[in-house]
Amino acid sequence: MCAKLVEMAFGPVNADSPPLTAEEKESAVEKLVGSKPFPALKKKYHDKVPAQDPKYCLFSFVEVLPSCDIKAAGAEEMCSCCIKRRRGQVFGVACVRGTAHTLAKAKQKADKLVGDYDSVHVVQTCHVGRPFPLVSSGMAQETVAPSAMEAAEAAMDAKSAEKRKERMRQKLEMRKREQEIKARNRKLLEDPSCDPDAEEETDLERYATLRVKTTCLLENAKNASAQIKEYLASMRKSAEAVVAMEAADPTLVENYPGLIRDSRAKMGVSKQDTEAFLKMSSFDCLTAASELETMGF
């Protein structure tokens, strides 16, 4: 029943058809607003669903348009005239009830829907991306058992979930361990005598510890000094550029506060913060550049 109904509703397929060209694809997309010719192409009934997307869909359907005379007489299959008559008409109401990655999870969701929310309407299960007959009660006569590929995908999904949980647990454990090590090292730097595992140091060991500590602090100071020099050199260039622009156009100094107030007001910055920023930036760039030059930057 299902196969015949799908073929009657969707038409024949041709799996060997080549894909649409770029122009044909554009024309097909614009079918509702354009009239460019393009070949009608269907390669398969099943859409390719990404591995991370749900594979199954739950929905309910309520028929509101009566069947034709042939269907009313007891025929199991839907006739072609009934299908044509219903095209373009509202003949029922469907409600998507949820999605799931596996049949087991779909069954769990369906049981919860029936037990907790709706014990009136039939909850049906279908494959995402595959045609499925709309029936108001019961299930379709032809059922498709999960293929080996689907079973493998379900197993891979479950295994991937377990791996993700294990990786998350390892990350949390590693992060906790790192925090403990950092806290212990910070405490030891402040007071080396608080190490519970430390034995009584000799004068030589104490000297070596202080020597290494001094060396590390000296290297950190050198690196910080280099960064400070780089910042001050960049500041001097910016100050010189500001001085040159003010000399070329004195109105820049007058219009600068108004522009800053308008811009920060649009950004939602309070007037108090804006005025504090303007006060902070009201220094003389020429004097600042001269002082930096005197300092050797």
UniProtKB/Swiss-Prot annotation:
Source domain of life: Viruses
Q: Which InterPro entries match?
A: DUF5832 (IPR043872)
Stated name of the protein: Uncharacterized protein 012L
Species annotation: Frog virus 3 (isolate Goorha) (FV-3)
